[in-house]
């Protein structure tokens, strides 16, 4: 100890001279030395430090830093260090270029078919049959005699052009989406700070500013941002599984294993380290470089590997890769992650770490709906083509009895190509490729706006899942309460003080114990700083409960800092840090005479049980019997708790000098036989806005439960203040022990039936451990008591909340109080730790659902009308009234633009006035079905009237039966124009889906909507007036325009008529877009794990499932082999630590499946058996191994189906899984 003090003193003297002398950055240790040192482990590292540098302080001296004061913080010095040792930043993978996104958008099957048809049409249009044979080829050539032949190429060219438009729009959408995510990443990066000592001051700096030589303070729950060597530690335990795959926590100490590695988690204790490697030179950085985060060669290898893989896997993965717009090396790494990343982990952790299946209800429903609509569209388009071809063949060769002439063949083919294009056009309009786009836009827009409501969304689909939430399990401290704690009552020298006593009232020796005990037995990182603003409240830094105790000392006019200066942190002999199992903290001091004194603080009932004495009124210790303890509980602790106070007991124990050295590792023998100093009551007031927010939740059909570590009386009092409990209601409040007793059988196993008896009535779970929280969440999610599977949101802030946060449908981590580990496991980070922000998330989630429904209502109306018009028109008049190019324009309005317009509606409070939709609620309600069919009826009547009687009404030439390549007719232009205007006005109707009357309500709050509607109208005018031949349009007069607009506006009036008809009367209406019902699932599947099977998967029969299991198994083996091969090429990378937020955030390749430390990312645990890189061979305890295999297998089919039915490539539904 003294040695260290001298060291720092000596250092302080030379510090400045060293800095001046070495202005060229000539440190006593090179980057290569540091890297080599950090790659060693435990004893090797110690040996190397001792041989080369003497000790840690030797390294500090060479790095020109003081172990006590830290760096000076001088900008020139920091710059020099960054130049020599690098910055703490890992360069992200280059984003996809716009051209790459364009190429991806071109992969769409429908677009490819159209391109081929257009090229064939182009080629054939240049063929002229020999003169004289014209008459023999039938009416084909009528148009050509009028000199129209040379314009035949225009249609083909126009189709190509519109395909280009669609591709550009899709690519632009993807590009802006990727840009947005990158912005979000950098935001998360900037928010992550770490505590370092600079110039003797403890400050927080952004992780990217940490540099080699910094002295960093590490504490429980931190995620280490750089590599370092321990200078001083208290009971420090690190989870290194993200780097080594070993799940046991590693104990770090100066004499055994002082190396701390970036990307690992501090699970217990605290300490200080000197930073030795940052950025790409840290262990995490080295692995990232191996994985090709920066390397060009790796990218090329990836390309090759991907090509091979795509061939082998039938292109199915190609789609998945597309979906994950920022994939990169993630695919290659998946097997490595799962094999080497933390196998034999504890059971509950393992379960929590299996990827969450059936994450997004909406995706499942939409996939199913899109596939159904796609199939119908394919059928319609096929029938259309067959009818057209048959009609033409019969008419030409049968009725007109024409011979087949060789020179007429190209003209006949031209006809067939025209029919084919009409068929494809029907398909283009029928396939709702805008659905995935609408979902993505809606979610991306919501995510952006949710930032303002203090929700930082890390996984897109969490936002939508929140709309379905039926239960919220919330922490108490900081979420429901203000987390500004103050001691308001105390039991000292056998008196219960209702307010803090004057220091004179307390015997001096008791006061002395109190001051020393609180000062040294609170983490040295906890302190009270002066207010930022004049007249404001003092700032509490660190653990808020400890700050309350330090505040008590200030109220007693004593300064804790004096004690800490006298006993610096290094002088503490042993520290038993606080964790959720101990629920207490103890610190041992060694006195000059060789005796020891231990101070303990913790939950009052836990510490009091260990007290055998108590300090009496005169300051002497007297015997403390169980009877006395019960008295204190009844007269002091329970009254405090019933007022909502958290009770903390402070105690101490002396170990005399003469006795043999205590066995310090045997904590139970050390922390016992204590003497009680005092019991204090700490108040943490309820946030004023919480009761109202909870009322909103209850009105919205969401049950709020409180899970807390506090004692049951405190918890009950706070729950009543918040409105979670109402006096006189029959709800349960349980303690963790009681809860466990009720849900376990004689063997101590948890039984679902027992949980099912408890959770519906449970409102408060007190004195609970993180395991209890996980058990409760799992129990509610797995329960089958209610018709609907519960959707559970959970808040968490501690390191051990990880499993519960992962198990929940949506995990909320605290942005302020939360540890990095909790943030890693979460889906959404609450930047203000406030419960009301969760209510906002519910609102946004429901809004996403409604936005998608609005879009569906609009899109399906257009689909129905366009398909029927194209089909009937083609069958009756041999030509689609809406040409291919016009259909593509309609498709653009209806897909891309409408999804933008309708998916960006802001949410309103009224969303909280209804119950959650539930998992099986159909996407298209009966009211929506009524609207869709009603509007489709109106539009079809208008279009067919114009088609078959329009020429008489407007007194123009009929456009029906026009020959090939005839010029565009006014007649068909009016049909097209009216059709588009009806869609435009119907877009306004689509804004309301619950049968509201006023469709204009709040329309001006949505600027995007207004811009798109007006913009579309302007473009429509340009197309009709100046589009000419390419768009098959001829100019219209003012009168014709007015008629078109009038018929378009008719949809608004018609909408009012429809909303007057009560839906309940229309018994024949069916809902659509269901989640899947139970009877559709084979029984074995249900038995495996009912709710873990994805909606879209349930359609598949058992045979298919087995078949895909086989396929998937092969696919996985290929994937593992490839990964293994790549790992050999790339210098046998170690499994990377994706677990650090700042790294994870800089790397798009890890954005996809999120950076959960030990998740087997191959979707099935089966695969791990084949994995050559596997370390521990114990099979993971998965509740449903087979199911996982089914899972990925079927994922595959849906992707195939989807690609077959043309989903717009840049945004297949799975792009939603892009983690933020």
Swiss-Prot record:
Membrane-side (Extracellular) residue stretches: 127-154, 387-418, 877-882, 949-971, 1028-1039
Phosphothreonine sites (modified residues): 1116, 1165
Annotated signal peptide: none
Short name of any one Pfam family annotated for the protein: Cation_ATPase_N
Lineage: superkingdom: Eukaryota
InterPro entries linked: ATP_Ca_trans_C (IPR022141), ATPase_P-typ_cation-transptr_C (IPR006068), ATPase_P-typ_cation-transptr_N (IPR004014), ATPase_P-typ_cyto_dom_N (IPR023299), ATPase_P-typ_P_site (IPR018303), ATPase_P-typ_TM_dom_sf (IPR023298), ATPase_P-typ_transduc_dom_A_sf (IPR008250), HAD-like_sf (IPR036412)
Localization: Cell membrane; Basolateral cell membrane; Synapse; Presynaptic cell membrane
Residues found modified as Phosphoserine: 8, 17, 338, 1140, 1155, 1178, 1182
Active site (catalytic residues): 475 (4-aspartylphosphate intermediate)
Binding site for Mg(2+): 475, 477, 797, 801
Positions bearing N-acetylglycine: 2
GO biological process: intracellular calcium ion homeostasis; negative regulation of cytokine production; negative regulation of cytosolic calcium ion concentration; positive regulation of bone mineralization; positive regulation of calcium ion transport; regulation of blood pressure; regulation of cellular response to insulin stimulus; regulation of cytosolic calcium ion concentration
Spans annotated as Required for basolateral membrane targeting: 1118-1220
Transmembrane segments: 106-126, 155-175, 367-386, 419-439, 856-876, 883-903, 928-948, 972-991, 1006-1027, 1040-1060
Region of interest: Calmodulin-binding subdomain B: 1118-1127
Region Calmodulin-binding subdomain A, annotated ranges: 1100-1117
EC number: 7.2.2.10
SUPFAM superfamilies in the cross-refs: Calcium ATPase, transduction domain A, Calcium ATPase, transmembrane domain M, HAD-like, Metal cation-transporting ATPase, ATP-binding domain N
Protein name as annotated: Plasma membrane calcium-transporting ATPase 1
Upper classification of the organism: Eukaryota, Metazoa, Chordata, Craniata, Vertebrata
